[in-house]
């Protein structure tokens, strides 16, 4: 995922100056790199420990599988094509993808029947209400911090003590990794972004780079307990306990931490593509 979401404040303004489009494009290269590294880790582990393999599929079987999943693959084309063609913004693309996924699930794959829709909507509403309650409190805390000028005071304090951008980014990574142990990703972004952004700007750190850095940290947080959402999803699929899965996931977690170090200190990994597309202006 490229991590193109933008946190909003109490009145709907962005908590940083980075747009959704900038963050979306800035996440493409880091996303491809991280996916490749995780894939390499998977292949290496499978080769080293001789994991069982499925029999090689024939071209007829591959074509059949491709034909069956073509409707799902079209979702990527609709989202990216619609954004690049200017048909809708990245935020609107999320709504379009939800409508498309609903249509495909009900009328094409028929995994979901019309009778199931009210139950699914009720479950989604319940989960959304819980998340929105958390986000509301996070936004209020962020608003209070901003209104009291605490970020600006912290920025001035750090500059007075000669803190450079490298030290600051190391601190940001530690802070976000610790927060990822006990909090949900959206809450962390809403609380920390308004505080960290003014300091980062004064230290010469591009807000888009900071945004991508936060997204990578959030992804790491989703892969370790106790709040790691990806662990619970994988546990349900693999029928493994959380403790057992936590031990098994360490090679991939280590890979993500190594990549986090790379993307932290090489800003061009995230800034090159949006700059090449003219989305960053003169920055």
Regions found by a protein language model. Name each.
Residues 1-283:
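Alpha-helical transmembrane segments of multi-pass membrane transport proteins
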């Amino acid at each position: 995922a490229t991590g193109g979401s933008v946190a909003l404040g109490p009145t709907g303004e962005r908590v940083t100056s980075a747009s959704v489009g900038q963050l979306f494009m800035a996440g493409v290269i880091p996303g491809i790199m991280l996916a490749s590294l995780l894939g390499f880790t998977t292949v290496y582990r499978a080769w080293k420990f001789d994991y069982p393999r499925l029999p090689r599929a024939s071209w007829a079987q591959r074509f059949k599988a491709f034909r069956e999943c073509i409707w799902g693959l079209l979702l990527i084309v609709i989202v990216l094509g619609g954004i690049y063609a200017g048909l809708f913004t990245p935020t609107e693309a999320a709504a379009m993808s939800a409508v498309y996924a609903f249509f495909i699930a009900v009328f094409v794959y028929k995994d979901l029947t019309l009778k199931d829709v009210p139950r699914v909507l009720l479950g989604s509403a319940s989960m959304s209400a819980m998340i929105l309650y958390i986000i509301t409190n996070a936004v209020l805390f962020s608003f209070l911090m901003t209104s009291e000028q605490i970020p600006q005071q912290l920025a001035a304090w750090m500059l007075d003590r000669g803190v450079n951008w490298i030290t600051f980014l190391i601190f940001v990574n530690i802070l976000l990794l610790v927060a990822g142990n006990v909090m949900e990703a959206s809450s962390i972004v809403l609380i920390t972004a308004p505080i960290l952004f003014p300091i980062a700007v004064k230290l010469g750190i591009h807000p888009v780079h900071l945004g991508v850095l936060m997204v990578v940290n959030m992804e790491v947080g989703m892969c370790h307990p106790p709040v790691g959402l990806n662990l619970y999803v994988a546990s349900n699929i693999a029928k493994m306990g959380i403790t057992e899965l936590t031990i098994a996931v360490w090679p991939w977690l280590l890979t993500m931490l190594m990549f986090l170090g790379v993307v932290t200190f090489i800003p061009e990994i995230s800034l090159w593509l949006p700059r090449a597309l003219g989305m960053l202006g003169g920055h």
